[in-house]
Amino acid sequence: MSTVASIIVSIAEEMRTASERGTVANYIPPLARVDLNRFGMAVVGMDGETHTVGDAEVPFSVQSVSKVFSLSMALNAMGDELWGRVRQEPSGSAFNSIVQLENEHGIPRNPFINAGAIVIADILVSRYGRENAQTRLLEFLRPLVSDPSSIDIDTDVARQERETGFRNMALANYMRTFGNIRNVVEDTLDFYFHQCALTMSCHQLAQVGTCLMTGGRNPLTGERIMSERNAQTILALMMMCGHYDGSGAFAIRVGLPGKSGVGGGILAIAPGVASIAVWSPGLNAQGNSLLGTRALERLVQHTGWSVFRANPWVANPT
């Protein structure tokens, strides 16, 4: 067993016996029914070597982790023009806060809070149309994984999010009054809810993340998926904003760019080294996976992969 493999097996055992597990997202009915004891982890290296443990092959709702992918598509489509409609700064507020929008005239602080991701969804609907945007999203993701047909959108989750997503409706309509939502609000939100209802496993999520690990290339084919500059921008935003008002604590504890979702998933990237996905559905007070964060903290402690180390990629896992 390789060192990384033995490390994540040890981590999974620690998480299995943890007494504090967090709380599932009970405001989205399908997520409220997920077993709190689920735990999976996957690590994919630059050479394609893959290590998985626990429920790493079980599909789950990636929710806000999907914002990394929609942002990648929007940056490919618009480039820096995008930053006229959404900023690049941490919010320091809850992911669904409306307060800052009023103070900042309908321009969201960053593309990972809900308001910012809704603007990104609006951009993609403008470019591709509501239905075709969903197809384009799947076409963007599927070439990056070894079993592409199993990445899909759970339409039941999307429907129930639409039926209960009153705060997101308020955010979209409020931004519409400032001209920052340019399509029919219902069309933009329909794509946004379907985007968040993406399902994939930890293994697949780690595979998708490899295009950020490699600076924008598909490691399976060598094809460039995005520019190196865009990949660096996304990683910087993941570090600053990927865990909402818990982003600073995550940066200190883990020290890797990461993006969480209320489905309990986290995608973390060690640039040039590894793409890591972890899933544990219990959330902390900020809406981030409690045990997922702890598992990544343990991984970095063992491997030395924090970007804040003096020589982060020199230390070998021990």
Swiss-Prot record:
Positions with a binding annotation for substrate: S64, N114, E161, N168, Y192, Y244, V262
Source species of the chain: Gluconobacter oxydans (strain 621H) (Gluconobacter suboxydans)
Reactions it catalyzes: L-glutamine + H2O = L-glutamate + NH4(+)
GO molecular function: glutaminase activity
One Pfam family cited in the UniProt record for this chain: Glutaminase
Gene Ontology biological process: glutamate biosynthetic process; glutamine catabolic process
Family, similarity comment: Belongs to the glutaminase family.
Enzyme class per UniProt: hydrolase
Protein name: Glutaminase
Sorted UniProt keywords: Hydrolase
Documented EC number(s): 3.5.1.2
Subunit structure and binding partners: Homotetramer.
SUPFAM superfamilies assigned: beta-lactamase/transpeptidase-like
